Every structure is written in structure tokens, then in C-alpha cells.
């Protein structure tokens, strides 16, 4: 970095104060967000009543999808259930031993779908790969796990197929609990696009059932599950005795989403009671600032996922970078002008550095931007990270409070299940969520309990298959 000139320190502190004002929402701002979100939620329910599974973005920014899940576990269930967790280049087969009293044991097997041994460059993700090839991997993975656990022989001898939940984290139109049509691939998947054996437009439950039959796997797909819904269900089973029932689920990680139990679901045309909101796309009356606008304008999906861009780990690093360039002005490192040159994980490392010398933070910035900052400058970066993460926690907490209110449980008590690395891995983030919950909810905050649903997607899918 360029050495300080006379007056630079005062300018830097003044700009930092501007960023602090931008990134510190007042209680009044959060209450306005709370009301705006509830109004948009209501518009979404009315949209679903009119149009069913068809999303009409002009009527609601959130999709408000029917999960088709009605039955939630109590924690007393016992037995074995399986899940296939598929949402990226790695697929997992998961076996849950439900022990009752909210306890469970997990074993799992993983496969990499970007296989170097596959004939196509991107493995089973490649556009020239066929759908049967991909779904055969799922069937073989779960068969191997069933064999290893002894369940395969038992199911064959008793002619009793095991229930399987299928976490399929791609855009789908859910027609029933065990019927979901892939709208389009995301996350780099193109399977079947240049192969007669396509996947897009097909019912993934049928594709899985066919693969299980081809490989003689005594299993039946009971449910297609979104990872956010799985989080709610997982915490419904594992919540601490004496705490309220889980009625809200959040993902706060690379992305953001929310689901909740809608008390009037049937009145709005839902077959289940759990609504998958796709809340990352919420954008009505958001308290955005000029830094947020700059970040959004340079994304590939400008104008979309606006709430997610304020909260999720994927965008936090970019918000920190843009804020830092503003604060340091002409002294900003050259590499700081490169988009995504600091990631959310790096910003988290800096925020987590409570040492006096900030050695970990200095090293993190050196790796990102190729400069060694002095202590004053690195403390400035640390403060920017704190502000951005705290605002994320404030907005996430506000939505959690709003959803507890919508479920009708704010006064009597509700548990909020949360998964996602940003929340699960960082105690300081969880503490910030608690702080802002109290700020928004006031005395009612004592009725809101947060539950970590580590691996909610796998556990939740297995539980849904077991109880629905």
C-alpha cells in the first residue's frame, strides 16, 4: 500500500464512519424490514392460491413453493431411514439410525460426480453424459451403504424396501411429496443436454426409482426434499427437550433461504404445511446502500437474489472489498480493485481474529491482495468485516422473528433450525443473531430458540421419508 500522506488518516476514519452508518441498521429500519417481509409473504400466499406451482414474479418476489411436507417428527421415532443428498459435484448416501429422544446416529458414503475416470470431461456433470448414468451412481452409492450396514440383506429377506428421502437441490416444480420435475440445471451441471437421455423436464423421483430397480436396490423414494425444509425437519427431531417445537428453518451459508410451517396452508392451496419460500430473492423495500447497489450491478444475476446478496457468505467478501476500496481511497491495494479478490471465508477469518497483533488478519490480506498492512490499516479491515457480518446477522434475525410471528408461535415459543457454514461455524455470528433477535422482538425474544442443524439436508430428507 502507498504510505500515508498528511490528512490520509483523517480521511480514512471519516470514510470508515460513513461505512459504519451504512452498515448499522437501527431498530426502526429492522422493524420496517420485518413488516415489509410479512407483507410480501402474504402476497406470496395469495399468489399461490391463484396460480398454484406457477411463480408469478410480478406478484411476489419469493416463489413460496409447496414442499408437500405435512408430518413433522416428534423426536420419539425409532428405526432406520436413508437419504440421498445431491446438490453439487459430490453426492452422499446417508443412513440415519433414529434412536428416539431426539437422538440419531449417522453413517454415510460419498461419491464424486466429476469423475476423472468418466469418458466425458466433466464426468457425470457433462452435457454429453446421460441421465441414466448419473442416477445409476445414486443407486449404486445407496446400495453400497445398505450392504455395508446389513440392511440390504435384511430388506431382501423380508421383501421390505427401505424408505429413502432424496435431497435434490436444483430448481424444481414439486407436484407431490415424491414427484418433482427438474426445471433446469445449475451449479455447473449439464447432464443430458447433448444426450438423448435428458434429465431437465423429467420427474427426478421416477428417474431414481428406475435406477434403483436397474440395480436391484430394495428401496423406495418417499420424498423429494429441499435442503432448507430438511433443516427444519432435522431440528424438529433433534430439538432439546423442553424447548418449543421447530416451525422455522433457515440456511445461512454460501446462500440464503427460509421455510416455515404455514398455519393456514390449506386455505392457500398448499398440500403440505411447510412452505419453501426461496427467500433469497426477496427484494421489496430492502434497506440497501450504494455499496450494495455496486455489488449487485456487477453480478451475473443483477437485480435477482437481492436479499441473499446482503446476507450470504458468497457476497459478504465482495461487500467487504468494495467498502475497503472506498475507505482506503487512493491508498487501496491494486489487487483490491479485482472483483471477488477477497472471499467470505477470508472475511470470516479476519472477523474471527481477536488477537492484539492481528497476525492472522495480516496474513489473510497478504494472500488476497499481496500487501502487508500495518496494524492501523488491518484494524480498519477488521472493523469493516465486523460491520458487514453484523448487518447480515441483523437481517437474518429479522426474518427469523417475522416467521416466528407468522407461525403464530412468537408468544408461546418457536424453535428456528439453522444450517449453513456462516451460522454453524462461527460463534460470533450466532451471538450477533441472538443480539438482533432481542433488538427486533423485544421481550418476545425469550420465546425464540435457535437450533443448529448441522447436515440438516441429509438428516432431514431421511426423516421426511420415515414420517411421511
Swiss-Prot record:
GO terms for biological process: glucose metabolic process; glycolytic process; intracellular glucose homeostasis. Gene3D superfamilies: 3.30.420.40, 3.40.367.20. InterPro entries: ATPase_NBD (IPR043129), Hexokinase (IPR001312), Hexokinase_BS (IPR019807), Hexokinase_C (IPR022673), Hexokinase_N (IPR022672). Residues 163-189 are annotated as: Glucose-binding. Residues 226-455 are annotated as: Hexokinase large subdomain. Keywords: ATP-binding, Glycolysis, Kinase, Nucleotide-binding, Transferase. GO terms for cellular component: cytosol; mitochondrion. This is Hexokinase. It comes from Toxoplasma gondii. The lineage of its organism: Eukaryota, Sar, Alveolata, Apicomplexa, Conoidasida.
Amino acid at each position: 500500500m502507498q504510505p500515508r500522506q498528511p490528512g490520509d488518516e483523517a480521511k480514512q476514519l471519516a470514510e470508515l464512519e460513513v461505512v459504519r452508518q451504512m452498515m448499522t441498521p437501527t431498530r426502526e429500519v429492522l422493524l420496517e424490514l420485518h413488516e415489509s417481509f410479512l407483507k410480501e409473504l402474504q402476497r406470496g400466499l395469495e399468489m399461490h392460491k391463484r396460480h398454484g406451482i406457477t411463480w408469478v414474479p410480478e406478484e411476489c418476489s419469493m416463489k413460496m413453493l409447496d414442499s408437500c411436507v405435512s408430518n413433522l417428527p416428534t423426536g420419539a421415532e425409532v428405526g432406520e431411514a436413508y437419504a440421498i443428498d445431491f446438490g453439487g459435484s459430490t453426492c452422499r448416501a446417508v443412513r440415519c439410525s433414529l434412536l428416539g429422544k431426539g437422538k440419531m446416529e449417522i453413517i454415510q458414503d460419498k461419491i464424486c460426480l466429476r469423475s476423472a475416470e468418466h469418458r466425458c470431461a466433466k464426468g457425470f456433470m457433462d452435457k454429453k453424459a446421460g441421465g441414466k448414468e448419473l442416477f445409476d451412481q445414486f443407486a449404486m452409492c445407496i446400495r453400497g451403504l445398505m450392504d455395508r450396514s446389513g440392511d440390504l440383506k435384511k430388506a431382501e429377506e423380508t421383501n421390505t424396501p427401505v424408505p429413502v428421502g432424496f435431497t435434490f437441490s436444483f430448481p424444481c416444480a414439486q407436484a407431490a411429496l415424491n414427484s418433482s420435475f427438474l426445471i433446469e440445471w445449475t451449479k455447473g451441471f449439464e447432464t443430458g443436454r447433448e444426450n438423448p437421455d435428458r434429465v431437465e423436464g423429467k420427474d427426478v423421483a421416477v428417474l431414481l426409482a428406475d435406477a434403483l430397480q436397474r440395480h436391484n436396490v430394495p428401496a423406495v423414494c418417499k420424498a423429494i426434499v429441499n435442503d432448507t425444509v430438511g433443516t427444519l425437519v432435522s431440528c424438529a427431531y433433534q430439538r432439546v427437550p423442553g424447548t418449543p417445537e421447530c416451525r422455522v428453518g433457515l440456511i445461512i451459508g454460501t446462500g440464503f433461504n427460509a421455510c416455515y410451517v404455514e398455519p393456514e396452508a390449506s386455505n392457500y392451496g398448499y398440500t403440505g404445511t411447510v412452505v419453501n419460500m426461496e427467500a433469497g430473492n426477496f427484494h421489496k423495500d430492502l434497506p440497501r446502500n450504494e455499496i450494495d447497489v455496486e455489488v449487485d450491478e456487477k453480478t451475473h444475476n443483477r437485480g435477482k437474489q437481492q436479499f441473499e446478496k446482503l446476507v450470504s457468505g458468497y457476497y459478504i467478501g465482495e461487500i467487504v472489498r468494495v467498502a475497503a476500496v472506498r475507505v482506503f481511497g487512493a491508498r487501496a491495494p491494486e489487487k483490491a480493485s479485482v472483483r471477488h479478490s477477497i472471499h467470505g471465508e477470508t472475511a470470516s477469518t479476519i472477523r474471527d481474529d481477536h488477537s492484539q497483533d492481528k497476525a492472522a488478519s495480516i496474513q489473510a490480506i497478504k494472500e488476497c491482495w499481496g500487501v502487508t498492512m500495518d496494524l492501523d490499516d488491518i484494524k480498519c479491515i477488521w472493523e469493516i468485516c465486523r460491520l458487514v457480518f453484523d448487518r447480515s446477522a441483523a437481517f437474518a434475525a429479522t426474518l427469523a422473528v417475522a416467521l416466528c410471528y407468522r407461525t403464530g408461535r412468537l408468544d408461546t415459543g418457536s424453535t428456528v433450525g439453522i444450517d449453513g457454514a456462516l451460522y454453524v461455524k462461527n460463534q460470533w455470528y450466532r451471538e450477533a443473531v441472538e443480539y438482533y433477535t432481542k433488538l427486533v422482538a423485544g421481550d418476545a425474544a425469550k420465546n425464540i430458540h435457535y437450533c443448529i442443524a448441522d447436515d440438516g439436508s441429509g438428516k432431514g430428507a431421511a426423516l421426511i421419508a420415515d414420517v411421511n
